[in-house]
């Protein structure tokens, strides 16, 4: 299928590109909003007909006590937030699977599980993770894990367990990265993505805006993502949730239209990736969320919490999707 790109009110058939420059991406980000939305709509309707939104539920399996110093994260042991550290606690397998079953009953398509780790370590906790992945897949759900860095062997074992996707965000641009985290390099993140891909697991990889970065930084982040070949299958776009006790606690909320611009540009750059409207959605309001759906977001996190931050409840999201006129799995599950 050919994707249509609008330029100067004309249509040009294009293929997926993996050679974007930062200047090109910045030009997209800074276009007049109506032009940007129009172009994103053309790409989205052509590449992803039907306007169907994937619902992903997210559970924090192991919360707090992380060795990383991510400036935005209340789970870091370096930050003085009120998230209780649980460095040795793993939620029991049966409890996780009960939550997954409840998410499916509510209409979720994907169940995501998070561990606040710098890296996966072999042992009982990893074996429990594998069992959880297998159990989630047996329920008929896609399974996604986020747990930091991993080895090639661990990636292979996760693939054998049936893991659908592994989440490992880039967070921000290579240029701004050391302002946000110093305990892991950008290259280590890229290498983790390569190991995931080599194991045959799909990539879930995106970033966060609102951390003090510039428009050029946002363009650079999107450029790195769009030049991954093939594109990440899922691209979460997060707005900073400034949590008390973290170094970024005093930053203002993200301008909702900046989230709309990020979603629209991601859609144009990565036509068939699932662009997931992720953290910070509660701060956007109904109208901005609908604009994000119009701009090409075709996945949301579904449920009342995202790891350690709040999220709209199921009833609110069902009303939102109905008002926007988009389709999701919960409609069929209620029939």
Swiss-Prot record:
UniProt GO molecular function: 2 iron, 2 sulfur cluster binding; 4 iron, 4 sulfur cluster binding; biotin synthase activity; iron ion binding
Enzyme class: transferase
Keywords for this protein: 2Fe-2S, 4Fe-4S, Biotin biosynthesis, Iron, Iron-sulfur, Metal-binding, S-adenosyl-L-methionine, Transferase
SUPFAM superfamilies: Radical SAM enzymes
Manganese listed as a keyword: no
SMART domains: BATS (SM00876), Elp3 (SM00729)
Catalysed conversion reaction: (4R,5S)-dethiobiotin + (sulfur carrier)-SH + 2 reduced [2Fe-2S]-[ferredoxin] + 2 S-adenosyl-L-methionine = (sulfur carrier)-H + biotin + 2 5'-deoxyadenosine + 2 L-methionine + 2 oxidized [2Fe-2S]-[ferredoxin]
Radical SAM core domain boundaries: 51-281
Record family assignment: Belongs to the radical SAM superfamily. Biotin synthase family.
Protein name: Biotin synthase
Organism: Prochlorococcus marinus (strain MIT 9313)
Gene: bioB
């Amino acid at each position: 299928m050919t994707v249509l790109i609008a330029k100067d009110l004309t249509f040009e058939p294009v293929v997926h590109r993996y050679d974007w420059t930062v200047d090109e991406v910045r030009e997209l980000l800074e276009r007049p909003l109506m032009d940007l939305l129009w172009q994103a709509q053309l790409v989205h309707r052509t590449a992803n007909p039907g306007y169907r939104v994937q619902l992903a539920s997210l559970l924090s399996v192991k919360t707090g006590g992380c060795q990383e110093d991510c400036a935005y994260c209340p789970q870091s042991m370096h930050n003085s937030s009120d998230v209780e550290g649980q460095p040795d606690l793993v939620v029991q397998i049966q409890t996780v699977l009960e939550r997954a079953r409840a998410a499916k009953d509510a209409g979720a398509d994907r169940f995501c599980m998070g561990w606040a780790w710098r890296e996966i370590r072999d042992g009982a906790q990893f074996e429990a993770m594998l069992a959880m992945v297998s159990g989630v897949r047996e329920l008929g759900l896609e399974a996604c894990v986020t747990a930091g860095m991993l080895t090639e062997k661990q990636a292979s074992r996760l693939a054998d367990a049936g893991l659908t996707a592994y989440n490992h965000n880039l967070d921000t641009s290579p240029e701004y990265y050391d302002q946000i985290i110093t305990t892991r390099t950008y290259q280590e993140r890229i290498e983790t993505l390569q190991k995931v891909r080599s194991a045959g697991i799909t990539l879930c990889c995106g970033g966060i805006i609102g951390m003090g970065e510039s428009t050029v930084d946002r363009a650079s982040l999107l450029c790195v993502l769009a030049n991954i070949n093939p594109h990440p299958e899922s691209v979460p776009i997060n707005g900073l949730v400034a949590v008390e006790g973290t170094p970024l606690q005093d930053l203002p909320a993200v301008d909702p239209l900046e989230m709309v611009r990020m979603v629209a540009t991601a859609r144009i750059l990565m036509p068939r990736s699932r662009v997931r409207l992720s953290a910070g959605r509660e701060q956007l309001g109904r109208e901005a969320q609908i604009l994000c759906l119009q701009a090409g977001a075709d996945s949301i996190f579904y449920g009342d919490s995202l790891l350690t931050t709040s999220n709209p409840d199921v009833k609110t999201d069902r009303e939102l999707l109905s008002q926007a006129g988009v389709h999701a799995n919960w409609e069929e599950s209620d029939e």
